[in-house]
Regions:
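Residues that form generic nucleotide/phosphate-binding pockets
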Residues: 78, 183, 187, 204
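Active-site-proximal specificity loops/subdomain of glycosyltransferases
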Residues: 2-92, 101
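Conserved catalytic core of nucleotide-sugar-dependent glycosyltransferases
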Residues: 64-65, 97-196
């Protein structure tokens, strides 16, 4: 959306003190408002002159989607900073997606030449309101595979991803009506941030 967002981990590091030695926190300091300088391929990013899976050039997408794509793809620099090697299994997720740990207990199914998507139970509004049982959530592949594409392309490539059933959870629009409205005004899908949708927020949260 272009709105500034808090650095939640940075502000709450003390709550994660038990695991801080395992966490590499990479901050994208600035996201451009113009991507005309990125029409050609750059490290870990798409060529904005290329076409997305739906037939639109990245540079022709609404600026909010270009910015979201940049931010998502830039996370690969954090993976690099963590010291990933080609054979490492990389899981990329949005913050509200949790992969089922049982998926990772036995990796005999994992083929490093493929990439995978975790099909998740998606819960909206409340922890017990199941909205969808096949949400395409976390993506899994090797670092060798990921660094030769982008995080965003990897996430959009549904056709070639191997599906893992019952593989996690996706929680969205939880909390009270104010949290709901905050998300609507903060993420890239600002087409949902309309008077009509906002007027129904209280009803959706309560019912």
């Amino acid at each position: 959306s272009g709105n500034e967002k808090p650095l939640y981990y940075q502000e709450n590091k003390d709550r994660f003190s038990k695991w801080n030695d395992k966490i590499v926190h990479y901050i994208t300091e600035e996201i451009p408002n113009d991507f005309s300088h990125m029409l050609e391929k750059t490290k870990y990013h798409v060529a904005y002159n290329d076409v997305d899976p739906y037939g639109t050039k990245f540079i022709d997408l609404p600026i909010r989607f270009q910015r979201a794509l940049y931010n998502r793809n830039n996370s690969s620099f954090g993976i690099e900073k963590a010291g990933a090697t080609d054979d490492d299994l990389i899981i990329t997720s949005d913050a509200d997606e949790i992969i089922n740990p049982y998926v990772l207990e036995d990796l005999s199914w994992f083929d490093p030449n493929n990439h995978y998507v975790a099909l998740c139970n998606a819960y909206y509004y409340k922890l017990n309101f199941l909205y969808q049982d096949d949400w395409m959530g976390s993506r899994l592949c090797t670092w060798k595979h990921l660094k030769n594409t982008t995080v965003g392309q990897h996430r959009q490539d549904h056709a070639n991803a191997y599906k893992i059933e019952n593989a996690g959870w996706h929680f969205s629009f939880l909390g009270n009506a104010e949290n709901f409205k905050l998300k609507l005004s903060s993420y890239e899908h600002t087409e949902n941030n309309t008077a009509e949708v906002l007027s129904n927020v209280e009803e959706k949260v309560e019912n």
